[in-house]
Amino acid sequence: MKMKETQKEIYQNKLDKGFNVTDVNKEFCLLYGEVAEAYDAWRKKRETVGEELADIAIYLMGLSEILGIDLESEIEKKVAVNRDRVYQLVDGVLRKTTDDPTPCQR
């Protein structure tokens, strides 16, 4: 199944179940909570890490659909950007060699 179809299916399920589809702030908070749950499961070496990561993907795709964002297209564009970036290791920190001064910790 293509990601766009999955986004639509997730959004439709939210509508069908009466879940939030209008409060973007709430969706970001719920997504944050799912990330925390996944981290906790990983930290405690639980077998539910995969399920928690799936929850993150579901919330992310639902939020993308609410915002009218084609997540698959955005991911493809970002992967291309990341692939073409050049970094330089400076004092143990990877830095982009472009004008962006934001360091990326290794």
Where are the predicted features?
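Flexible "arm" and connector segments at domain edges
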Residues: 1-106
